[in-house]
Structures are given as C-alpha cells and as structure tokens.
Amino acid sequence: MIPDMDPDQPTPTSPHAGPCSHHDHPRPAVPGVALHWCDEQAEIHRIVVGDFENNVFVLRCRQTGQSVLIDAANEHDKLLELCRALDVQSVLETHGHWDHIQAVPAVREAGYRVAVTADDAAMLPSYDDLLEDETVLEVGRLRLHTICTPGHTPG
C-alpha cells in the first residue's frame, strides 16, 4: 500500500524524506512507539510487539489526524492504546500468518474494522472487509492503493 502524496513533495523513498523533528511532531504517549518517518502530509509510527518482534505500523494523515493500523500482530493492550492515541479508524492486515493477526479479535471487539485480502481471509479468526488488488482506501486526505503480492501467503 502506497499513499498518494503531492508529487512536488519528497516521497518515502526520496533522499529528502526522513525522520521529522520531534518538536514539530510529538510522539504519542505510548511506550515503545517511535515516529518512523514523516513529511508534511503523513506520519508513520512504529511499535515492535511480541516474542517474534513484529513491526506494527500506523499511517497517520497529518492534515486530519486520522490513521490506519497495519497488522494487529499481538500485545493487543499496547495496540489498542496506540489506536486511541493516534485516532486509528481501521486495521489493515498485510497477510494472515498467526504472528500478524493475534490481536484481531481484541481490535474488532473495541470497534475497529479489520480488512484483509480474500485469499487470506480464512486465516483470520474474524474480519470485516475484503481487500482486492488495486483497492483505494482513504485515510484522512491520504489515499492508499493496495497491491496484492501472493507468495508468502495466498493473498
């Protein structure tokens, strides 16, 4: 998933993109959360959870404050705290392996919608929405385009 951004602004892969000043972009008050990357339009926050040290990311629109959690891996208490701190609207699962989905029941119970590809949906204990290749999702004023890359899992 790649957010659409202003073509005149640096992208996450450009040499001009990088960590923002923490003075301009305060971190959420959640232990273990780091501001991984940002520019004028978006922030990416990262937390590492579980025994397998899974990376969980939150993409946040800087203009609206709305966010999406990427992979409800495990340690649901930490993830729910992060969701509340960063105004998460929904959860996107990158794939259905057990170490990326353990917190799905807890985040759904807390009211967050969970989306996954149809080919991996059966691997999740539950979900709300199916993602197709080239689905466009809005997170505030950002647009995410899904790209299905089967191989690691079916979807």
Report residues per predicted region:
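Accessory terminal helices/loops
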Residues: 1-39
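Conserved beta-strand hairpin/beta-sheet module of binuclear metal-dependent hydrolase folds
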Residues: 32-86
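Glycine-rich His-Gly loop
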Residues: 61, 96, 151
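Core dinuclear metal-dependent hydrolase active-site scaffold
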Residues: 36, 46-47, 57-58, 134-155
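A composition/secondary-structure signal for short, hydrophobic, low-basic-content segments
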Residues: 5, 12, 91-96, 148
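Intrinsic disorder/low-complexity detector
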Residues: 6-10, 56-57, 73, 99
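Active-site HxH/HxHxD metal-binding segment of metal-dependent hydrolases
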Residues: 53, 67, 74-145
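Short acidic/polar alpha-helix capping motifs at helix-coil junctions
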Residues: 19-22, 41-48, 67-70, 97-101, ...
